[in-house]
Amino acid sequence: ALAGTIIAGASLTFKILDEV
């Protein structure tokens, strides 16, 4: 479960960085 949260967080961060 923790790994999934980390992956989701990393994916979200990457999406935000890509949007900038």
From Swiss-Prot:
Its main location: secreted. GO terms for cellular component: extracellular region; membrane; nematocyst; other organism cell membrane. Residues 9-20 are annotated as: N-terminal region. Residues 1-10 are annotated as: Plays an important role in the hemolytic activity. Keywords: Cytolysis, Ion transport, Membrane, Nematocyst, Secreted, Target cell membrane, Target membrane, Toxin, Transmembrane, Transport. GO terms for molecular function: toxin activity. It is found in: Secreted; Nematocyst; Target cell membrane. GO terms for biological process: killing of cells of another organism; monoatomic ion transport. Octamer or nonamer in membranes. Monomer in the soluble state. Hemolytic activity is 3.6 x 10(4) HU/mg. Composed of a long N-terminal alpha-helix and a core region rich in beta-sheet structures. Before the pore formation, the alpha-helix binds the lipid membrane, partitions into the lipid-water interface and stabilizes the monomeric molecule on the membrane. Finally, it traverses the bilayer, thus forming the transmembrane pore. Pore-forming protein that forms cations-selective hydrophilic pores of around 1 nm and causes cytolysis. Pore formation is a multi-step process that involves specific recognition of membrane sphingomyelin (but neither cholesterol nor phosphatidylcholine) using aromatic rich region and adjacent phosphocholine (POC) binding site, firm binding to the membrane (mainly driven by hydrophobic interactions) accompanied by the transfer of the N-terminal region to the lipid-water interface and finally pore formation after oligomerization of monomers. Belongs to the actinoporin family. Sea anemone subfamily. This is Magnificalysin I.
